[in-house]
């Protein structure tokens, strides 16, 4: 269940950042979210794959068992906004955290 909390939190932060001229990418980093780098990389990779976020580079390498992720200019997409709006379960989890 924590994975959905992290997904919602990342999307919510990116949604709020739409009003900002500059965005501090550390706000959605694994240290700020207090999760492992492998879990964070997999979550961010899934968010990009599902087209909930953009401005992220994801690739795989032989020396690492999880995806490598580079935050270039992360932004929430229309799909991500719809996910936030439609997913009431995530709202409940986010508010309970």
Predicted regions and their residues:
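Short amphipathic alpha-helical interaction segments
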Residues: 33-50, 54-57, 70-71
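Generic structural signal for hydrophobic core residues of well-folded globular domains
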Residues: 14-17, 47, 84-87
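Short amphipathic alpha-helical interface segments
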Residues: 1-32
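Short, solvent-exposed secondary-structure capping/transition elements
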Residues: 22-23, 56, 92-96
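Short linear capping/connector segments at secondary-structure termini
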Residues: 25-30, 58-64
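Short, amphipathic alpha-helical interaction segments positioned at domain boundaries
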Residues: 62-97
């Amino acid at each position: 269940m924590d994975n959905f909390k992290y997904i919602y939190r990342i999307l919510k932060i990116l949604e709020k950042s739409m009003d900002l001229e500059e965005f501090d990418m550390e706000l959605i980093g694994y240290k700020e979210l207090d999760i492992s780098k492998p879990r964070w990389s997999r979550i961010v990779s899934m968010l990009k794959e599902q087209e909930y976020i953009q401005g992220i580079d994801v690739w795989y390498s032989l020396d690492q068992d999880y995806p490598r992720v580079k935050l270039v200019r992360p932004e929430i997409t229309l799909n991500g906004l719809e996910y936030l709006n439609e997913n009431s379960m995530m709202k409940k989890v986010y508010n309970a955290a």
